[in-house]
Amino acid sequence: LPVAFLKFAIVLILFIAMSAMIEAQCIGNGGRCNENVGPPYCCSGFCLRQPGQGYGYCKNR
């Protein structure tokens, strides 16, 4: 196999692994969240919190 192909394959594998790690650091819909505390944030980008509650739940807008 050509060296260029092996380099490309290694970079591709690293990119896929990093993408999976970044995605795993967010909270899925239905999970508890607190936008005031910081990461991890909701994957959807929206944390629904009722007034008076210390936490909310991730959901789509």
Curated annotation (Swiss-Prot):
Tissue: Found only in seeds.
InterPro entries, alphabetized: Antimicrobial_C6_CS, Gurmarin/antifun_pep, Gurmarin/antimicrobial_peptd
Signal sequence, renumbered to the chain: 1-24
SUPFAM superfamilies noted in UniProt: Gurmarin-like
Pfam families from the UniProt entry: Antifungal_pept (PF11410)
Post-translational modification: Three disulfide bonds are present.
Subunit details: Homodimer.
Family of the protein in this entry: Belongs to the AMP family.
Protein's name in the database: Antimicrobial peptide 1
Organism, as annotated: Mirabilis jalapa (Garden four-o'clock)
